[in-house]
Each structure stands twice: as structure tokens, then as C-alpha cells.
From Swiss-Prot:
Gene Ontology MF, one: 5'-nucleotidase activity
Origin species: Thermofilum pendens (strain DSM 2475 / Hrk 5)
Disulfide bonds, paired cysteine numbers: none
Gene name as annotated: surE
Compartments, as annotated in UniProt: Cytoplasm
Coiled coil: none
Pfam families: SurE (PF01975)
Name by which UniProt lists this protein: 5'-nucleotidase SurE
Alphabetical list of InterPro entries matching this protein: SurE, SurE-like_Pase/nucleotidase, SurE-like_sf
Catalysed reactions listed for this entry: a ribonucleoside 5'-phosphate + H2O = a ribonucleoside + phosphate
EC number: 3.1.3.5
Cofactor: a divalent metal cation
Keyword terms, alphabetized: Cytoplasm, Hydrolase, Metal-binding, Nucleotide-binding
Length: 260
């Protein structure tokens, strides 16, 4: 089995070290990551400048660095470095990736969703912690490592569920033993814009958000309120589904306007 290991936090993230260790011995693993942190880049691709690839050694193992986004990594890995993998694993992200709002902006998820578009299943791992240090050592690190290893091995052994293209896995900030399959909440944060002025009096803006109340039965509630490991299945076919009848009125009016 060929496994591509990636993330959006760059080569020196303790979450990447956990993921590299978790897949060791499962097959032929290749590690390809953005050369610098690329959080919140979603499915973004670099189309306005060339991409560079470098290589370094971490703990005696090769790690390839791409001067782009996690989505860029997928295409560079497949076409330049290692060929098409059987599985992509991404993470372990510093911070949770909960809700549709965050899933669609996350670089960690962007990598596995981009791979899914190319027909390769993927698993994204995230931990609801505030700092990298929490994944560097101690009982919590061991919990995340053991859980990640167990999930990857279970998926490899059982195979990906039918109709599922990617799995979004989130670990709570506390050691847990309960694992639940849940839907994503719609939102994780309320959004706001702060306007400020620079020394020249020109305005600039910061985007930020406050956590919203967790929807019961959602990934946000399971991880942040109940302290459980949440697995959320994601399907591209769900995004592609449509009902022609639902748009019949709109289509009719457009046709009438164009026929005048």
C-alpha cells in the first residue's frame, strides 16, 4: 500500500511526527508537506507562480517540501515525487477542524478533499489543542498517537465505507476512549471584521470570530462538549447531487426572457 502523509502546518509540526509514526510499517509511506504553515488555505492552488520542491531528512527519513498549499502538495506528490497513492493522511492539525465552515477552509482538509477529487480516499486528523507543545510529549501525545494509529489501521483493514470519500477525525483536548460518528455542524464561529488604521491613517482589517453554541449531535458538540473522538464521513457525491425540478421555475423564467 502506498500512503501519502501531509499536513498544513509544515515539516516541523509535532502533529506530523505523530502521523509519520502512526503509519510506519503499514506500507510505502511518502511524506510531502508545505514548506511553511498554510492554515486556512482550503482547496486553494498556486497558479500565479512556479512551485519549488526541496528535500530534508527528519529522524533519518526523507521529507519533501513544496512551496505551495496542501492542495499543491497533492498534485506535486502524485505527478513528481511518488505517484498516485492508495491513501492520503493529513495532520495531525494543531487545533480542531470542526463544522462545515471550518472543513471548507481548512488546509488539512483541503489536502484530503483534493486527493478525493483525484479518486484517492483520505483521512484528516486534528486535535482540539491551542499550542504545538501539547502534542510534543506526555500522556496526551500518546493518546493522539494511539488513536491515530488505531484509526488508520482499522480503515486499512476494513476498507473505506461505500460512498465515503474522506474522513474528518477530531480529537478532544482531553484523553478519551469513546469514538462517535457524527455529522458536521454548520458553523463553528460567528464572523466579524475589525477596522483599524495604520500610522498613515489608512484603514486595514482583521477577520475574527467567536465560537457559536454547539449543535447537539454534531462534531462540535461531540468533541468540545462531550470530550469524544469524532469521525465525520465526507462525500463528494453529496456536493454533486441536484434536483432539476427544484430549479424548474428559475429555468422557465430565464428561457422566457431569452426568447423575447
Amino acid at each position: 500500500m502506498k500512503i501519502l502523509v501531509t499536513n498544513d502546518d509544515g515539516p516541523f509540526s509535532p502533529g506530523l511526527a505523530i502521523l509519520r509514526e502512526a503509519v510506519r510499517g503499514l506500507g510505502e509511506a511518502t511524506v510531502v508537506v508545505p514548506e511553511t504553515p498554510k492554515s486556512a488555505t482550503g482547496l486553494g492552488l498556486t497558479l500565479h507562480k512556479p512551485l519549488r520542491v526541496n528535500r530534508l531528512s527528519l529522524d533519518g527519513e526523507p521529507v519533501y517540501l513544496v512551496s505551495g498549499t496542501p492542495s499543491d502538495v497533492i498534485y506535486i506528490a502524485m505527478n513528481v515525487i511518488s505517484g498516485k497513492p492508495d491513501l492520503v493522511v493529513s495532520g495531525v492539525n494543531i487545533g480542531d477542524n470542526l463544522s462545515v465552515q471550518v472543513i471548507l477552509t481548512s488546509g488539512t482538509l483541503g489536502a484530503v478533499l483534493q486527493a478525493s477529487i483525484e479518486g484517492v480516499p483520505g483521512i484528516a486528523f486534528s486535535a482540539a489543542v491551542d499550542t504545538p507543545e501539547e502534542l510534543e510529549e506526555g500522556e496526551y501525545r500518546n493518546f493522539v498517537l494511539r488513536s491515530t494509529k488505531a484509526i488508520v489501521r482499522a480503515v486499512v483493514g476494513e476498507g473505506f465505507p461505500k460512498g465515503v470519500d474522506a474522513l474528518n477525525v477530531n480529537f478532544p483536548s482531553v484523553i478519551a476512549s469513546d469514538v462517535v460518528v457524527v455529522r458536521p455542524a454548520l458553523k463553528r464561529f460567528s464572523t466579524a471584521v475589525v477596522r483599524r488604521k495604520d500610522p498613515q491613517g489608512r484603514p486595514y482589517y482583521w477577520l475574527y470570530g467567536h465560537p457559536v453554541e454547539a449543535e447537539e449531535g454534531s462534531d462540535v458538540h461531540a468533541v468540545l462538549e462531550e470530550g469524544k473522538i469524532a469521525i465525520t464521513p465526507l462525500s463528494l457525491s453529496g456536493m454533486l447531487s441536484y434536483s432539476p425540478e427544484a430549479l424548474s421555475g428559475i429555468v422557465k423564467k430565464v428561457k422566457e426572457e431569452l426568447s423575447r
